[in-house]
Every structure is written in C-alpha cells, then in structure tokens.
Amino acid sequence: MAEAGTGFLEQLKSCIVWSWTYLWTVWFFIVLFLVYILRVPLKINDNLSTVSMFLNTLTPKFYVALTGTSSLISGLILIFEWWYFRKYGTSFIEQVSVSHLRPLLGGVDNNSSNNSNSSNGDSDSNRQSVSECKVWRNPLNLFRGAEYNRYTWVTGREPLTYYDMNLSAQDHQTFFTCDSDHLRPADAIMQKAWRERNPQARISAAHEALEINEIRSRVEVPLIASSTIWEIKLLPKCATAYILLAEEEATTIAEAEKLFKQALKAGDGCYRRSQQLQHHGSQYEAQHRRDTNVLVYIKRRLAMCARRLGRTREAVKMMRDLMKEFPLLSMFNIHENLLEALLELQAYADVQAVLAKYDDISLPKSATICYTAALLKARAVSDKFSPEAASRRGLSTAEMNAVEAIHRAVEFNPHVPKYLLEMKSLILPPEHILKRGDSEAIAYAFFHLAHWKRVEGALNLLHCTWEGTFRMIPYPLEKGHLFYPYPICTETADRELLPSFHEVSVYPKKELPFFILFTAGLCSFTAMLALLTHQFPELMGVFAKAMIDIFCSAEFRDWNCESIFMRVEDELEIPPAPQSQHFQN
C-alpha cells in the first residue's frame, strides 16, 4: 500500500510538472476567464478607477523620487553582485536561479532520474580534479646556490616562495631519510638539517655531518699479551651532506658538480651495502630504498650539471643509463630532462622515439610532452607555412596535423603560448609546478623557448593558430575537448608557488556576468534621467513627448537623430541659428 501511495504521488507530481511546462497557456486563459467572471463581486472596475485617479494626482516629483529610489536600489544590488563575483567568481543571482529556482520549475528531472548512474562519474571527475591539482616537483629545477641565490644577489628579489621551499623540504625528508637514521650520527644530523628553515643552519649541519665522518674509530684488537695493535677504521661518508652543500653552498655549477661527484662516491658505496642487506628485514629494506633515491638524485643532478656546462652528449648518455638502470623510478621524470637535452642536440628522431614511449594515454601528460609533440609536427611544415596561402587553398594534411597538435598542447596548458611568443616576461621557474598551470608554463618556456626559436617558422605557426583552441572549448571549466575540464584550483596554487612580483596568468579570464553589466547600465541610465528631469522638467517633458511621437509614427523605420532634434526644436520654438555673412573685398 505504501509503495502504491508513493507511486501515485510521484505520478501526480509528474503530471503537475508536465501541465505547468506544456499547458501554461491553458492555465493562463483559465485565470483570465475566472477574472472576467468574478469582475463584479471583486469590484475590479471600481478598483481600476481608484488606481487611475491616484496615478493622475501624482506630481512629477513623485516620479523623480521613485526613479532615484530605484537607482539607489539598483546601485546597491550592483555593489553586492560585484563583491560576490570578486570573492566567489560567480553571480549571486545567477547561482540562486540555477540552484534553487530551476529545480522548482522542473529543470532537473533528467538529472534526478540518472542520479545513481552519475554518482560514479562524479567520483571519477573528483579524483581526476584532485590529481590535476597535485603539485609536482619540477624536473628541470635550478640549483639554489649557483642560480637562485645569484639572482637574489643581483636583483634583490627572492625567486622562491616559502611555500615552494617548504615543499622541497618535505621532498628531501621523504627521499633522503629513513627510520634507521638515528643509528648513524651523521644521518641523524642530516635528518634535522632538512627540517631547518635557515639556509646557514642547514649548511652548518651538513659540514658537521661530514666532520663526524672524518673522526676515526679505533678498535682494539689484542694480538700479543704484551702489546696491542690499533686498527684504524674510517666511517662511510655522508652522501646527503654533499647533496645539501652542492645544492645550496656551491656558487657555480662547476663547484656543485665537484660536490656531487663526491656524493656519488659515498652514495654508491652505501647503495651497494644496503643492496646486499635489503632482504634481512623491513629496516634494511627502507634503508635500501632511501639509498636508491639518493643515488638516482645524485646521478640526475650530475647529468644536469653536464648539460649546464655544455657537455650535452655526456648528459644524454648519463640520463639514458640512469633510465635503464632504474626504469621504475618515474617520479623524477628524467625523460623530460632527456627530451630537453636531445632538442639541444637537434636529434629530432631520438626525441620522437622518446615521445612514442611516454606520450601514451595511460601516462600522465605534461607541457613538455604535449608541446614537444607539437614542435615536431610544426617543424615539418612551419618553414613553408603562410596564413594567406592557407586561407586560399586550405590546410594540407601535414598542416592540419600540426595545427591539431598545437590545439592539443594549448588545451592542456593555455599559459605557455604567451611565454613562447614573448607576450609575457619570463621569471626563474619554481622548484615545484602545478600541471596545466602558470608555474608549469614558466618552467617549460624557460628551457624550451630557444628550441622553438631554432625551428624556422614554428613560432609563426603557433602565433597564427593557438587562439583557435578556445573556440573549440567555449566552457573549459565544464567540458574539455581532448582532456578533462580545466581545473579551477590552478590560480590559487600558482599564487602560492610563484613570487609576488610576478603577475599570475589566469585562465579562463573571469568576465563580469551580463546581469551585472545590465544592472550597471540600467542604474546609470535611470540616475541620469532622474537628474535631468529634476533639473530641466519642461525640456525633458518635451523631449519625452517628441520621442513618443517618433516611436508611434508610421515613419519610424526612417527615423534618425536629426529628426528627433528637429521635433524638439519645433516643440520649444527655438529660432534657427543665424547664417554667417560673407564679405567681399
């Protein structure tokens, strides 16, 4: 019985909604008919006469006051709408209309019927949004001592934010520490050093860790009863201490490379020892995992030092060997370093081979992957591309592929073209980036702008085609074309990652809703009319009468501004202006 009653109520509700949706004209005529039938009991004629008499007794000052009051209310609404839009990025009235009024009018029936089916899709989109708003370590990050600090010494500006450096400290604690560090004095010191906020305190702690390893431990071994022999044993070097000094104390890339080579000797020895003991327990396994991260980090930074010092082929070889030795450590994104080095060598065939492996639908994308693929496609046609010729004959297959690759890259990260086309100034890239955000665009363009300039016509092709992407995705926050909708969180995260002197690029740009613009125009227009009517009541009355005559005339289609002013002059009986006299000598 209960189920039957519930079904009947649902059917009744659906019938009512259907009637209001499709039969509103019938309801309207029914209401008019009832009003006509009840016109005598309701005294409609008397009430209309009373209202007409009241309106006839009103003075112009009442209408001026009414107009001023409406202008004031419209201004208050405008101010509130502008404040709400600046704070939340949407119109308050639009949000209320969509969220509360639309369900009452039956605009969400389809969604309610598919509620159970859409729950899984919502959860998937939420997970995707969270993954896209994740902050990643910049695979091409600079050296603090040799590059970031030198920029600070020259300009007096801090290129790194506290939030960015705090994320780096968390990464160092994750990669370079383990639970057994307290058993070794040097590692215990370094565990505290990674938590230090003061750079000088971190450097001092690294030196202290190295000094502890210089102390020799003596082990007394009795060989003869009458004498003893002292066996001298050196403690292993602390690789993480060398890493910290190379990153923060070295003022040149050459000095950093020397320190990383010392770190490689120490880290390689620790890695070999822990590799033999990794199966003896969870503690040894964690230590081996830490030593693996240390060794991979050192080799990657050594390859980057070689790339900075101009030994690009050596850097490519080191990166390839590292990727073969540790193929599962994709967290460091070494393939992006390899792509940049191969582009410097102009080894485009090797670049294409790397892209074929990593530009896969199952792997996370990046600006380096998408824009490098677009660069290779553009390289095939950019030297002969001409917008005029393309508009006459149309795009060829190769040109169409290049344009589609550019559109794909721009959809993934729409901030990059402004930096590649030098429409915005570059800054030093941060140590962490947000994929599809302004921080990733800066990190990519900082290293890859030279590669785009080297390919003849590539920037011209990008300049002619990149804005066409936005016509394909008019609502990027709601629906994408080749990727998921653009995440909303990029602006907030980029403001935390990028320094304050940089103007963060925002996509899509927040435009004022039409309701706010309409309210502003209506408010200004009514306020102006009220002011003119109060100051010049006779002139405004004549002007209004002339406007009514023009709108009601049969020749309204031929009206213009001159006819309006002629009618106003006729009403006011303004004499014509005297004609100028010409004198002859």
Swiss-Prot record:
Going by the entry's taxonomy, the superkingdom of the source organism is recorded as Eukaryota
Q: Carbohydrate attachment sites?
A: N47
Q: Which GO terms describe its cellular component?
A: membrane
Q: Where are the transmembrane segments?
A: 15-35, 62-82, 512-532
**Phosphoserine carried by residues:** S386
Q: Which InterPro entries match?
A: ST7 (IPR007311)
The alphabetical list of record keywords is:
Glycoprotein, Membrane, Phosphoprotein, Transmembrane, Transmembrane helix
Stored CDD domains: ST7
UniProt membrane topology term:
Multi-pass membrane protein
Subcellular location field: Membrane
Question: Which portions of this protein are annotated as coiled-coil regions?
Answer: none
Q: Hey, which family's this protein in?
A: Belongs to the ST7 family.
What protein name is recorded for this chain? Suppressor of tumorigenicity 7 protein
Organism in which the protein naturally occurs: Muntiacus reevesi (Reeves' muntjac)
Source taxonomy lineage?
Answer: Eukaryota, Metazoa, Chordata, Craniata, Vertebrata
